[in-house]
Amino acid sequence: MTFINEINDILWTYILIIMLLGCAIWFSIRTRFVQFRMICEMIVLLSESAGKGKQGEKHVSSFQAFAISIASRVGTGNLAGVATAIAIGGPGAIFWMWVIALLGASSAFIESTLGQLYKIRGKDSFIGGPAYYMKKGLKQPWMGMLFAILISITFGFAFNSVQSNTICAAAEHAFGVNHIILGGVLTLLTLVIIFGGIQRIARVSSIIVPVMALGYVGLALVIVILNITHLPGVIALIVSHAFGWEQALAGGVGMALMQGIKRGLFSNEAGMGSAPNAAATAHVSHPAKQGLIQTLAVFTDTLLICTCTAFIILFSGAPLDGSTNGVQLTQQALTNEIGSSGSVFVAVALFFFAFSSILGNYYYGEANIRFITHRKWVLHGYRILVGGMVLFGSLATLDMVWSLADVTMALMAICNLIAILFLGKYAIRLLNDYRAQKKAGIQSPVFKKESMPDIEKDLECW
């Protein structure tokens, strides 16, 4: 554990925070702050339904691709990750979580647009993501292979261990359920769904995600309304702990910054290279459409759902001395607000949040296993290993699974950020093309690869 923690310190303190913020600021400027200027367009695009392919097959719709990415994003990071960030970094961590979401959404636009641009045709849907744009766009197949290995490990193994660990911790706290029994049930459910393929994952995600998100946000809004007089004080607490002199002298600002960005990235995945795998599956007329929709997903995750958790914890007066950490802190906070049923509600909500994340995480791994090899036995073996890691996570300690996830997440994000820095110019050209068509009165812009002759030969699906 000490060795893993030392690697984490190097990656997060000296490399990733600088790269994340640097890329986020750069792309915000280059896109003229697309994440703010085109919010209304994002909402309109989300309603687009699946179209028919040339052979008449049904594709994954914009909403389903959005649901897959939200299924992965909205999970443990929103309930347990936010609580961990506050417990370790203080309330100021929430401010930096907001910052990385607001600025990092531009990176999400770039990577998801590139995922659409360089996608290829799969058996039952389109397939794409960073591994594909590294190979086809950067002409660096070794880099694509490295990324594919990293994301397959990060999402299929490390992140899914975190999800199952948190589900079991919450269930034990609320119901006294044995970890082994619940871990076995989770593993069985996971295997049944993932062996059904992307279409089954898309259908399940598009049902679970809206219901669970609306239910959780609705409860949080009730709590905010009941504590509305305390809202200015909570916001002031968040800001003061992000910049206060007392915190700066104690090293608290740096801890808040690191925890906010680390847990924010785990939750919203902006710039990490995961969402492009979901974005690439959608059947749309222009790559920029999925870029815009995935930008909205970042806001939905962090500014809405993570903020709900933060307010629930800070309104409750739950101790932030480190005596309670992770999902138990969220459960204790909600119990303080609505009584003993709060712990049960968190356990149930977390089951759906985290289980949908397991499905979304698995799909990211599958898309990249298919990049590495088309051998069916490898894919089946990967599915079984994913189930095994779900079981492992249910039995492991909290610190172990979070530390492993932090290392693999950092390596994956660094690899992707390097790629989008070089390829981002193409996403910006696509954004300009989309804006020009909208300005010309075209209601639904259409991209034709002939408009980019310098890379036309690398684009399979346009």
Specify the residue positions occupied by each region the protein language model found:
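Transmembrane helix-loop junctions in multi-pass membrane proteins
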Residues: R30-Q35, G77-V82, P91, F155-C168, ...
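Alpha-helical membrane segments and immediately flanking helix-loop junctions
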Residues: G53-I88, L114-L117, K123-A131, K135, ...
